[in-house]
Curated annotation (Swiss-Prot):
This is Vesicle-associated membrane protein 1. InterPro entries: Synaptobrevin-like, Synaptobrevin/VAMP, V_SNARE_CC. The record marks Q60, K61, L62 as: (Microbial infection) Cleavage. Residues 33-93 form the v-SNARE coiled-coil homology domain. Residues 28-38 have a biased composition (Polar residues). The lineage of its organism: Eukaryota, Metazoa, Chordata, Craniata, Vertebrata. Expressed in brain and spleen (at protein level). Isoform 1 expressed at very high level in brain. Even higher level found in spinal cord. Isoform 3 expressed in kidney, spleen and liver. Isoforms 2 and 3 expressed in osteoblasts of trabecular bone. Also expressed in heart. PANTHER family: SYNAPTOBREVIN FAMILY MEMBER. It comes from Rattus norvegicus.
């Protein structure tokens, strides 16, 4: 004779409804989600720290570049004024040379005229 069939015990811990394989307890799932979220938050925090460091480095480089640009502007201003002075100096030198050349030509013409008429 066979033993009477026993129905499956209901209310067993971890048993899925319908008699399927038992699922993870709900507390474990929420812990896993919490850990995943915390890992994502830590990753975002690390990325933001790197970004802040990069922004600070960029700010420092921009400050150095601004200082160099100011120094270059000052040098350009000095160069411009000295170039203008040099231009004026050689313009006057050229004028003096032209006056001397004109005077020499005038003297030569006067000498030739005097030589011809005497």
């Amino acid at each position: 004779m066979s033993a009477p069939a026993q129905p499956p015990a209901e209310g067993t811990e971890g048993a899925a409804p319908g008699g399927g394989p038992p699922g993870p307890p709900p507390n474990t799932t929420s812990n896993r989600r919490l850990q995943q979220t915390q890992a994502q938050v830590e990753e975002v925090v690390d990325i933001m720290r790197v970004n802040v460091d990069k922004v600070l480095e960029r700010d420092q480089k921009l400050s150095e570049l601004d200082d160099r640009a100011d120094a270059l502007q000052a040098g350009a201003s000095v160069f411009e004024s000295s170039a203008a002075k040099l231009k004026r100096k050689y313009w006057w030198k050229n004028c003096k040379m032209m006056i001397m050349l004109g005077a020499i030509c005038a003297i030569i013409v006067v000498v030739i005229v005097i030589y011809i008429f005497t």
